[in-house]
Structure formats: structure tokens, C-alpha cells
């Protein structure tokens, strides 16, 4: 019950309206002023009597049930409720809002009854025509029900024994059973182990505590069986330290441990069963597609191979019919081209498909003599020392190919000699050549000036005048006998004029300086006609040599310059040699 509008006579300026009795008990209004005119006093009496009559009329409509509480509309208008001076006294704002809400709710209820049930009330007389227009324009649907509002405390008390159940509670239960309203009622629980300790610490009345204990074991209505599983993920701390436990944890996860809920387990079982059956069908369908796709792919590959094979075969046939002719290149690039034949194949543009490998023959280019001289000269310079015996011997015989022979152990030169051996064609020896013959490539290298011979060298039995462009004297019989003991590697030469000699001075640095050699065993295979090693006596048949650019002492010399004179005598006489030092 709400008792309202109990008024006390106050002056006109301090008139309070709409304040409840409960608020006035706690907060009494200000005292009455001493100076009050009789006219105002009589006016206050009339106002108070009118407000009392309004309150009596209004109290007949109010009830304890907030849902059915109805208040008369004329009571608000006739009483002239205002809040002009209530801004300073805001004790009853909540109750005023509640009254306004109830008023609005009553108006909507009356309108709904007029729309859907055609019940006419006092409040909806003015809205009758409008509601008829609304119903005529389109149909209306109304859903009736009772709103369940959860109390703010979080729990509600229910009696345990049937005898203690009140009549109002039985009526509400009967209404809920008859109607289609779905309502959930229960008690709010806290999922914590310390709830009992917290509840005991709270100051409660004894009756409330006893009633709560009774409610914990009470069963209101039981319909079916409810099973609830609480699942949680627990991570073991020792999994990071022990690998076995981590493996066990993965196995448990595969098996579905920990259990989640029966519905989830059933769902997993059904999905596994359905997946097996569906996967078999999918595999059978995909097998046909895969086979057809693979057959088409294989057929495409075979066609591509069949197309590419004639092209490659035709290219090979063309290359065999028309041998590859190498273009003329500078002499300094001969070895580079021959060492990389694949670049020539790619540059020839005869092969249409780059991915195929074409192997064909390649004609050999003539040996570049000047480049070979440089390579051998560099090799000998690296390996020779003052006492070494490595030398390059070049023999300038007429109408005879120049031959190279070296005892160098260089792997590069020997490997090239093995791969590409030079031609060993021997030409007939001819001694009838004029001295004014055009000098050859080696003669251009062996240019020099005449060196005066020492006086003691002129005491030989048959002094021979030295000339510049004469041929070397033939090999004597004594030398032939000496050479025969060496082996079949030396070649016999006929006797010629024994009064010829040569003398030269080295002018070009490219010429290899002669040094005495040591007979080494033949480690590398070569033809018998190769003159790789010369005897010391044959080597000393050369004329006096002077080294103006670089002085390298030979065996038995004591100075930086070496002056030697060699004289050859006919008739197989031994060769004499003299040396002079500074």
C-alpha cells in the first residue's frame, strides 16, 4: 500500500504537493509562518479539504499488485498536482515516476482492449474512431503473456512444504500450468569453493539462514533427468620437462580426453562414421577423375615427345651431313674456342631445341706456333733455375716442320700435348739452299750480331770462318756412335759441309735462354721420332752466344757474362769448346 498526499497547512508560497506520507515523516516540511493573513488561512483550508477528498477517491483504485494498480485519471487533473516548489524537496521523485509509468501502462492497456477486444472504456472514448480506422486498414496481432522480471537480489524464496504454500502461490502455479508461458525460476549459485565461508561471514538473520538451508535440499518440480558435465582444460606443468608426458598428452588429445559432454562425444562418433562412408565415396569418384586426367596428361606428354624427337633427329642428321665449319678467329682465341666446344654449338644456331644435347665432330685447327712458344717459354721460366736442365730445342731445318720438345713437368702443357698431339711428318733433308733465303719465324726470333772470337779459340787445327746465315754442320761419325748408345730416339743426319758455323746474339726476350739439360726418363708416351733430349755435345755445337739483356751463369762460369766459341771439324773429330769469363 502506498499512502500519499497527507498534507499539512502551509503558506501559499511554500505549498508542497505530491509528497508522500513516508517522506514527510522523515523530512517534515518547514514550520508555519507567524504572519498569515485570514484570507490565506481560509484558502488553505479549502485546498486541504479538496486534496483530502481527492486522496480518498484515488485510494479506492490503488492496490498492492503493481501490475493491476489502476489510478483514476480525473484524480490527477482535478487535484491540480504540480511540482512547482518540489525542486528543493526531491524526496518523492521515484514514486512520482512510478505513478507516471503506471498511468501510461493503463492507457496502453485500454487502447489494446479497444483495438483487439472492442472494449470501450472512459479513457478511450476519444480514440474510438481512430482505433476503428486502424483495425479496418490492416489486421492486428496481439501476444499476451506475463513478463518474468529477475529480482535484483539474485534469488527468490519458495516454501518447502505444501501446507505452507499460500493460496496466491497456488493460483499463480495453476495459471502458469494452464497457459503457455515458459518461466524459469530458481536460485542463483556461485561456482566457487569459498562460497560457504563468504556466506557465513555475512551477517544474516537466523530465520533467513534456516530457510536457505532448507532450500538447498528442496525439489520443487522434477521433469526428466538433467545431466551436467563440467569440463576444463588442464595443462600439466611437467610437460615442458618430460617428453614422455607431452607425448601422452597428445595421445589423450587424439582420444578426446578430457571428456567434454555426452552430446559432443556422440557428435564426434557420428561424424567419424559419416566421414568414413563419405570418404570412400569421394575416393571412388576422384579415382575416375584422376585416371582420366592422368591418361590425358600422359597422352599429351607422348605427343610432345613424338613431336620433339623428329626435330632433334633431323638436327643431328643435318649436322652430320653438313659438318660444322668454324669461323676464322684470331690466333689468341684458338685454345679458348677448342677448350669450350659447347659454346660453338650454341653459337652455330643449328640446334632448334636448346634442351637437347647435340654432339658432333669438330675439325682441328692448326697449332698456333707463336702462342705455343709463349706458353712453353713461361713454363720453362717458372721451372728453370741456374743448375736446371730444362730447355726448349728448336731446329731450323729447311722444308721441315718445326718441332717442339720439352722436358718440363707442367701438367697443362703435357695434357694439351696428350690430347692434341702435333703432326710428326718428316720431310726430306735438303742442303742446297741459298744463304739469301727468306728467314722463317724461328729465324726472326734468333737474330743477333757477330761476336769476336777469343785468340785461344783460333788455335784449333782447322779454323773455320764464321758466317751468319749458313746452316749448321752435319753430325760426325763419332757423334753418331755416341748417339747410338743413347737410344733410338736420336735421328741420323748425313754429312755436309763441316766448315760452317753460326753465331748469334739474342735480341728478343721471347727467346728461351739455352741451358744445360739433364737426361730424364721418359715418363710420357711419345713417338720415336720425337727429339725431346739432346746430347751435351750436340747442344754445344752452337756458336758463341752473348746475353746482353739478362746474364744467367751456366755450369763452370764465374761471371755474369758467358762468352763461348764452339768449333766443329769434319772427319768425325771431336768438338772443342772454350769459355771466357770477365
From Swiss-Prot:
Disulfide-bond pairs as recorded: none
Annotated Gene Ontology cellular component terms: cilium
Region (Disordered) residue spans: 16-67, 413-438, 485-512, 545-582
Superkingdom to which the source organism belongs: Eukaryota
Keywords attached to this entry: Cell projection, Ciliopathy, Cilium, Cilium biogenesis/degradation, Disease variant, Joubert syndrome
InterPro entries: DUF3719, FAM149
Intracellular or extracellular location(s): Cell projection, Cilium
Polar residues bias locations: 48-67, 563-582
GO biological process annotation, one example: protein localization to cilium
Record field: compositional bias (Basic and acidic residues): 28-47
Disease listed for this protein: Joubert syndrome 36: A form of Joubert syndrome, a disorder presenting with cerebellar ataxia, oculomotor apraxia, hypotonia, neonatal breathing abnormalities and psychomotor delay. Neuroradiologically, it is characterized by cerebellar vermian hypoplasia/aplasia, thickened and reoriented superior cerebellar peduncles, and an abnormally large interpeduncular fossa, giving the appearance of a molar tooth on transaxial slices (molar tooth sign). Additional variable features include retinal dystrophy, renal disease, liver fibrosis, and polydactyly. JBTS36 inheritance is autosomal recessive.
Family: Belongs to the FAM149 family.
Subunit structure: Interacts with TBC1D32; may play a role in cilium assembly.
Function per UniProt: Involved in the localization of proteins to the cilium and cilium assembly. Indirectly regulates the signaling functions of the cilium, being required for normal SHH/smoothened signaling and proper development.
Protein name according to UniProt: Primary cilium assembly protein FAM149B1
Species of origin: Homo sapiens
Lineage summary: Eukaryota, Metazoa, Chordata, Craniata, Vertebrata
Amino acid at each position: 500500500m502506498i499512502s500519499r498526499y497527507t498534507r499539512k497547512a502551509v503558506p501559499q508560497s511554500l505549498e508542497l504537493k505530491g509528497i508522500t506520507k513516508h517522506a514527510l515523516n522523515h523530512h517534515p516540511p518547514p514550520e508555519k509562518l507567524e504572519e498569515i493573513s485570514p484570507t490565506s488561512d481560509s484558502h488553505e483550508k479549502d485546498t486541504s479539504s479538496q486534496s483530502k477528498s481527492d486522496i480518498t477517491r484515488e485510494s479506492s483504485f490503488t492496490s498492492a499488485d503493481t501490475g493491476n494498480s489502476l489510478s483514476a485519471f480525473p484524480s490527477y487533473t482535478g487535484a491540480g498536482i504540480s511540482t512547482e516548489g518540489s525542486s528543493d524537496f526531491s524526496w518523492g521523485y521515484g514514486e512520482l515516476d512510478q505513478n507516471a509509468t503506471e498511468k501510461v501502462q493503463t492507457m496502453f492497456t485500454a487502447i489494446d482492449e479497444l483495438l483487439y477486444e472492442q472494449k470501450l472504456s472512459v479513457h478511450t472514448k476519444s480514440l474510438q474512431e481512430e482505433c476503428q480506422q486502424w483495425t479496418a486498414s490492416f489486421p492486428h496481432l496481439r501476444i499476451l503473456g506475463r513478463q518474468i522480471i529477475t529480482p535484483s537480489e539474485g534469488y527468490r524464496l519458495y516454501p518447502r512444504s505444501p501446507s505452507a504454500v499460500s493460496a496466491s502461490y497456488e493460483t499463480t502455479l495453476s495459471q502458469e500450468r494452464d497457459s503457455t508461458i515458459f518461466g524459469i525460476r530458481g536460485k542463483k549459485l556461485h561456482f566457487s569453493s569459498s562460497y560457504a565461508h563468504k556466506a557465513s561471514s555475512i551477517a544474516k538473520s537466523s530465520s533467513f539462514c534456516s530457510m536457505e538451508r532448507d532450500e538447498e535440499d528442496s525439489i520443487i518440480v522434477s521433469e526428466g533427468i538433467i545431466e551436467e558435465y563440467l569440463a576444463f582444460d588442464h595443462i600439466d606443468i611437467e610437460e615442458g620437462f618430460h617428453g614422455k608426458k607431452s607425448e601422452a598428452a597428445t595421445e589423450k588429445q587424439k582420444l578426446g580426453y578430457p571428456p567434454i559432454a555426452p552430446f559432443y562425444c556422440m557428435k564426434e562418433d557420428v561424424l567419424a562414421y559419416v566421414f568414413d562412408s563419405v570418404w570412400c565415396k569421394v575416393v571412388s569418384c576422384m579415382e575416375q577423375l584422376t585416371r582420366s586426367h592422368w591418361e590425358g596428361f600422359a597422352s599429351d606428354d607422348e605427343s610432345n615427345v613424338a613431336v620433339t624427337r623428329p626435330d632433334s633427329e633431323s638436327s643431328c642428321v643435318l649436322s652430320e651431313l653438313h659438318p660444322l665449319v668454324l669461323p676464322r678467329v684470331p690466333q689468341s682465341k684458338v685454345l679458348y674456342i677448342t677448350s669450350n666446344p659447347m659454346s660453338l654449338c650454341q653459337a652455330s644456331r643449328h640446334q632448334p631445341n636448346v634442351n637437347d644435347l647435340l654432339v658432333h665432330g669438330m675439325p682441328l685447327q692448326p697449332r698456333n706456333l707463336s702462342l705455343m712458344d709463349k706458353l712453353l717459354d713461361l713454363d720453362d721460366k717458372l721451372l728453370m733455375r741456374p743448375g736446371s736442365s730444362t730447355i726448349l730445342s728448336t731446329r731450323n731445318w729447311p722444308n721441315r716442320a718445326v718441332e717442339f720438345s720439352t722436358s718440363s713437368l707442367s701438367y697443362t702443357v703435357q695434357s694439351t700435348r696428350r690430347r692434341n698431339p702435333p703432326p710428326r711428318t718428316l720431310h726430306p733433308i735438303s742442303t742446297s739452299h741459298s744463304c739469301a733465303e727468306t728467314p722463317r719465324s724461328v729465324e726472326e726470333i734468333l737474330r743477333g750480331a757477330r761476336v769476336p772470337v777469343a785468340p785461344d779459340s783460333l788455335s784449333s787445327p782447322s779454323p773455320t770462318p764464321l758466317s751468319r746465315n749458313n746452316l749448321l754442320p752435319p753430325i760426325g761419325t763419332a757423334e753418331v756412335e755416341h748417339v747410338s748408345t743413347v737410344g733410338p730416339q736420336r735421328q741420323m743426319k748425313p754429312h755436309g759441309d763441316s766448315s760452317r758455323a753460326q753465331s748469334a746474339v739474342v735480341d728478343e726476350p721471347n727467346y728461351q735462354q739455352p741451358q744445360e739439360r739433364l737426361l730424364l726418363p721418359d715418363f710420357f708416351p711419345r713417338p720415336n721420332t720425337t727429339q725431346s733430349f739432346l746430347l751435351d755435345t750436340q747442344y754445344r755445337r752452337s756458336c758463341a752466344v752473348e746475353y746482353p739483356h739478362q746474364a744467367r751463369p751456366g755450369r763452370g762460369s764465374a761471371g755474369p757474362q758467358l762468352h763461348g766459341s764452339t768449333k766443329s771439324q769434319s772427319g768425325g773429330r771431336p768438338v772443342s769448346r772454350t769459355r771466357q769469363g770477365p
